[in-house]
Curated annotation (Swiss-Prot):
Source species of the chain: Thermoplasma volcanium (strain ATCC 51530 / DSM 4299 / JCM 9571 / NBRC 15438 / GSS1)
SUPFAM superfamilies from the UniProt entry: eIF1-like
Keywords: Protein biosynthesis, Translation regulation
Membership in a protein family: Belongs to the SUI1 family.
GO annotation (BP), single: formation of translation preinitiation complex
Stored Gene3D superfamilies: SUI1-like domain
Protein name, as recorded: Protein translation factor SUI1 homolog
NCBIfam families the UniProt entry points to: PRK00939.1
GO molecular function: mRNA binding; translation initiation factor activity
HAMAP family: SUI1
Amino acid sequence: MKDKNFTGMPKELQPWEGFGREAQAVKIVVDKRRYGKFVTIIEGIDPKIEDIEKIAKELKKKVASGGTVKEGRIIELQGDHRQEVKKFLEDMGFKVSVEQ
C-alpha cells in the first residue's frame, strides 16, 4: 500500500515533496573516534519535514557503510564519506556545507 496523506494522493505525486530542502542548512563534519576510526556526522536536516530514517538508509546504501540516527535528527556514518554524502544530498536539493 502506498503512503497517502490528507489529500489521498500517493506520496510520489505530491507536488510539494522536497519543498524547503534548499532552505535547510545541512552541515557535514568528520570526527575521529576511538582507535582512530572516523565518523561522518550529518546534521541540520529537519525531521519534521524530512524522513530522516529513510535518508539515512539511502546514504548507508550509497556509501556501503554502517550508520545510525542519533536523537532523531543527526545521521552518523562509519568512515569518512564527506564528498559522497555532499553530492548525494545536493542532488536531493539540500544546501550542504562541509567542514574540514
